[in-house]
Structures are given as structure tokens and as C-alpha cells.
Curated annotation (Swiss-Prot):
It comes from Streptococcus mutans serotype c (strain ATCC 700610 / UA159). This is Guanylate kinase. The lineage of its organism: Bacteria, Bacillati, Bacillota, Bacilli, Lactobacillales. Its EC number is 2.7.4.8. Keywords: ATP-binding, Cytoplasm, Kinase, Nucleotide-binding, Transferase. One of its GO terms (cellular component) is cytosol.
Amino acid sequence: MSERGLLIVFSGPSGVGKGTVRQEIFSTPDHQFEYSVSMTTRPQRLGEIDGVDYFFRTREEFEELIKQGQMLEYAEYVGNYYGTPLTYVNETLDKGIDVFLEIEVQGALQVKQKVPDGVFIFLTPPDLAELKDRLVGRGTDSQEVIAQRIERAKEEIALMREYDYAVVNDEVKLAAERVKHIIETEHFRVERVIGRYHKMINEELPLPLR
């Protein structure tokens, strides 16, 4: 039976560039994990593909899945639900495959309660002025929504202490390399690998004949 995979939880404020950094990580052939597509009730943006960028569902459909206990985590953010389907994550981890979750901060804290041995990585902007420029540059939100996102970002940055690692997204390629290095290092933590060596610890070897 293969070892259970590693759950990698990646989050940060809206507009910090989570999706861009994640795409950079997955653009290289050396990554050894699968991306877990999140589910949301927010409107589908131009160029987004259902089942690739997100699973887009109505509010009624999402709430029914919550009632059925089919979400690993979920959160309501600026009037929309975001969450992670439970079945896919468990099936993938049980196969020994690492799962990469890109989720909101509220959801990440829920996951930490259920899967405390996951790897929790917080992506932060260099400063709030840069974050505001990125939100304005997207051209998808009103000034009122941008102001809400900035205030929410302050609250989320204060929760950074709940994470294992913080990565500054000052340059996409560099941030992606930092995240990959963290994941690689986590695979060598003693508490993750000790199970492989139980047989070695208990094994008795015959002494050489003289």
C-alpha cells in the first residue's frame, strides 16, 4: 500500500496572485502533485473553464452539497461561496498523490482543523499599495468591492501566523520556486518518513562468521 499523499494548502488575499503563481508551478514538468479544483458560486469570468479553473455551481447546488457533508471546507467571501469537494481530495491522497489546494483563508483554517498535518503556505503581497494596483488592474471589480477586498486582506494577513510558511509574491517565478522548495523540503521531515524505516529499525541482521 502506498503512503498517503501530502495535502498542500495555498492561500492568501484576493488579488495577491495565487492563481498566477499556481499556474507557474504547474507549468514545469517536475511537479509531483495534482491541483484540486475548487467550487464556487461566483460568476464565471471571461476565459475561465468549468472544471478547470473552478467548478461553477448555483448557490442552491452548493448549499445542498454542504448539507450532504460533501465539502472538505467552504467559506462565503464577498457574497459568494468557495469550497473544496471532499471525495476527490481523499481519493487522490489515498493513492499516494500530493494534492495542491488553492483556497481562501477561511477555508484553509477549516482544513487545518481536519488535516493538521497538511502543509499550509500563505502568499502575501509586498505591500497593500501593490495589492490595490493588482486589484484595480484586473478590471473586474467596482471601487466598492476593491475597498472591501483591501479591508479583508488586512484581516487575512493578520491570520498568517496560523500558517506554516509565508511567501512574498514580489516576482511570480521566484515565488513559485519558493513554494516548490517548501513542498520538496516537507517530504523529508522526519515525522513524514519515519514509517518507511520501521522495518529497518526492527530488522536483525546475522553476524558475519569468523
